[in-house]
Amino acid sequence: MAKAKFERVKPHVNVGTIGHVDHGKTTLTAAITNVLAKVYGGVAKDFASIDNAPEERERGITISTSHVEYDTPTRHYAHVDCPGHADYVKNMITGAAQMDGAILVVAATDGPMPQTREHILLSRQVGVPYIIVFMNKCDMVDDEELLELVEMEVRELLSEYDFPGDDLPLIQGSALKALEGEKEWEDKIVELANALDSYIPEPERDIDKAFIMPIEDVFSIQGRGTVVTGRVEAGIIRINDEIEIVGIRDTTKSICTGVEMFRKLLDEGRAGENIGALLRGTKREDVERGQVLAKPGSIKPHTTFESEVYVLSKDEGGRHTPFFKGYRPQFYFRTTDVTGDVQLPEGVEMVMPGDNVKMTVTLIAPIAMDEGLRFAIREGGRTVGAGVVANIVA
């Protein structure tokens, strides 16, 4: 059985380094791969190969990101590191690199700096659930009291953004010294790895979450009823399951009387699979692209939300001019566009291409959404921005 085979594989956890420029994020990333390769086996990566991050395009947005992997005895980690601040902003907002937890790097020589704060705020907005702190460059600070002061500052800053600042793990170390092979500092990297293992819970697999499938297409089959097709985003749908059809119109209920894939009938459809679901008693005209099939009660339709948005630069194919409050583009959620009205924060008069901004959006039709849902902003089919739902208002 395929499932039994999968269980032998270590749980897979996605993490990343965040923090102010030049505080040592990339050096730490290199140190983790080197020390853990030495201690637990695996492949070491040097600073230059991580720092020379390849450019990727996610939804038309250019992002430079380095991906490294490492293992602890119980887990396999995929770790992202970005060279520039703008890359972090884009990465976190588009969800190109979903993080189950982040390692916040703060130089003990500087303490928290503007981007430290900005990355913590972004983590809160986009729903990074856990943060572990690595205080770097501690070999350069002789004064024990100064280290305590910086630790206190970092913890207070995290608490300010609703992270458990007093309780989360904070490791004082030196990424450079660990990379140079000094045992005392290498041990701090192992301590960091242990903190990742113990503090970040094993992420729930998509298949174990509540069932949801965005509807891509609808057609009727003579004598059998209405079939909706799409890719199962999470969970499992089985024959005779009750489901809700959510978004755009009033929520309705139906029963799934059949699941098919490549014209073969199945007992169930699982996360990641492209399926057709046959719905009992649902008419072809009652369902449309852009709605979702979902486990009853698991997701609600909403029209108004606060979001964190990155606006594409002109070079990325975005707008050439700024926009102002009352801007009415299309918001593309999962499989469909819905027009929405934009309100900007107090004191923000206009938004320039290349900016990131917090905005409140009111859609003209409700969409099934939870906090953390990603969307694109489009004008006439062209993507001009990317965003994430930070807070649902109504």
Curated annotation (Swiss-Prot):
SUPFAM superfamilies: EF-Tu/eEF-1alpha/eIF2-gamma C-terminal domain, P-loop containing nucleoside triphosphate hydrolases, Translation proteins. GO terms for cellular component: cytosol. It is an enzyme of class 3 (hydrolase). Keywords: Cytoplasm, Elongation factor, GTP-binding, Hydrolase, Magnesium, Metal-binding, Nucleotide-binding, Protein biosynthesis. Residues 60-64 are annotated as: G2. It comes from Pseudoalteromonas translucida (strain TAC 125). It catalyses: GTP + H2O = GDP + phosphate + H(+). GO terms for molecular function: GTP binding; GTPase activity; guanosine tetraphosphate binding; translation elongation factor activity. Monomer. CDD domains: EF_Tu (cd01884), EFTU_II (cd03697), EFTU_III (cd03707). This is Elongation factor Tu 2. Residues 81-84 are annotated as: G3. Residues 19-26 are annotated as: G1. GTP hydrolase that promotes the GTP-dependent binding of aminoacyl-tRNA to the A-site of ribosomes during protein biosynthesis. GTP binds at residues 19-26, 81-85, 136-139. Gene3D superfamilies: P-loop containing nucleotide triphosphate hydrolases, Translation factors. It is found in: Cytoplasm. InterPro entries: EF-Tu_GTP-bd, EF-Tu_GTPase, EFTu-like_2, EFTU_2, G_TR_CS, P-loop_NTPase, Small_GTP-bd, T_Tr_GTP-bd_dom. Belongs to the TRAFAC class translation factor GTPase superfamily. Classic translation factor GTPase family. EF-Tu/EF-1A subfamily. Coiled coil: none annotated.
